[in-house]
Amino acid sequence: MGKPRLPNQKKAYKELSKRLAGYMVRVRNIYDRLNEKAAMLVESVGYDGLKEFSFDDYPEIEREIKLLQSQLVEEMRTLIYSGTSSEWKNSNTFQDAVADKALKYYRAQIHGEKFKHYYRDNGDQLNAFLQRKENGLNLSSKLWNQSINYKESLETTISTAIEKGMSATALSKKLSRYLNDWPSLQADYQEKYGKATNIHDCEYRSLRLARNEISMAYRSAEQARWQQFDFILGYKIKLSDSHPRYDICDDLTGDYPKDFKFRGWHPNCLCYTVPIVMSEDEYWSDNRENSPNKITAPPKNFGEWVDKSENLERIGKANGKGTLPYWLRDNAKIKDCSVLMSKARTYGDAIQKQAETIARKYDGVVTPINYKGFSSMYRKLNSEKNMLVSDIKDSVRNTIIVEKENIKSVVKELQSLPTFDRYKSQTPEKFCGYSGNIINLKMPNGIQAEIQVNTPKMIYAKETEENARRILGDNVWEQIAKETGLQGGLGHKYYEEIRILDEKKDKTKIAELTKLSKSYYAHFR
């Protein structure tokens, strides 16, 4: 089945990069103009460079310095507002062409009333984007903070750059060079004053803020339009040809759901996106919304990246500081899963130790602590209607394995713990013949931990041979095999076969497998 050939996204992002470079030139021009004025003020007060420069020593130019700061705020705000509005429009113009191409391929009426929603430019979302606050700061507040940094940077730069008899013109050029080359300023300041400077790279911060705001406006407009395009199944996030070095961008390429909000993996991200579109048959299908080709979850490599301990540690720290990246802040389910996984790691060792202490009293063993992976957690959230991440009670889990006569005693000990929250009995009738005990513990950071309690025989029946041997040991596994004369792990096999069947279409097959599963588990109870 063919698909529409859409306008070239890669080329569009290359054009965006060129325009962004133009905006950066304008930011540097703003700083050059301000540096000229600052140099003239320094010349007017006769600063001789015998000690470090401070504007506080020259109250006669206090008003002019405040005007300089206000000028920085106003000119940067004008540039960013103008740039975001222009790129919102550019993005929409390109998406108009995408809609035209798609509708033409699908042989639909491009200007028909039915397809008007494809062409909404979402101006209300642009206004919301411009007025938004992040960590309590709107754009004006961020720029005013930068103007304070600029004033402090000027003091350090003037102290470093000044030479006896230097003209305002020469000083302004040196100020611009230093503010555009932060490492040189730091090195020269250290050499001149014998100490490190603790100020921030203000010009770079302004460049980054402008570039990110304008780039995010383009991406946000694009994604708003894609929500209106019901012919889009998802989209690919791809590396730019200009990608400078290996980083998170390499790890997270792939196909994403179209409701995954992407404004870049990091500041100045060069990745670009390409929509995945329907074939003509899919588009005119009565069940278009449920296309089997619809992307419903992030790619496998995304989950693997989140699962890594070092990344979860970074996510946990960023969440605590309120500095999560946009791709987490903007995607609630993904953020909630990632933060929960990070919190689960905090108490894994303590839960394992607690379970082992109880198991030893009854000559039992404990499975190694297991953390629920991102893909499994995200799939669970998406598959159950109205489920919240707080409903997930097994983000961290293990199993205590003891003989049947000790089960009640172990459960009682777990129920006596101060963190005990809930007990659940897994009955054969509800779980295809499998039976067990689940204890949930509520940890101080709010997560729910799960400790299961079961017998060696039930583990033999439920787990694959490889897993069961690892948990029980070869001697116990072989003893149960000899005693029962039954193959181990069929419970897991039946479960996996049932899990992938359709409840409505495969009722008969599900009933057959359920009967087999119940009969099998009955031998191990």
What is each of the regions a protein language model found here?
Residues 1-188, 192, 279-338, 342-355, ...:
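N-terminal leader/targeting and assembly helices and adjacent pre-domain segments
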Residues 66-81, 209-220, 453, 463, ...:
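Short, hydrophobic/amphipathic alpha-helical patches that form generic packing surfaces
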Residues 137-143, 193-194, 256-257, 380-386:
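Active-site-adjacent structural elements in folded domains
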Residues 144-247, 392-410:
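Long, positively charged binding patches that form subdomain-scale interaction surfaces
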Residues 193-289, 412, 419, 425-440, ...:
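Acidic, glycine-rich two-metal-ion catalytic cores of nucleic acid-processing enzymes
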Residues 272-275, 315, 401:
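Conserved catalytic-core segments centered on acid/base and nucleophilic motifs
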Residues 330-391, 507-525:
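Charge-rich, low-complexity segments
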Residues 382-525:
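Long beta-strand-rich cores associated with HINT superfamily self-processing modules
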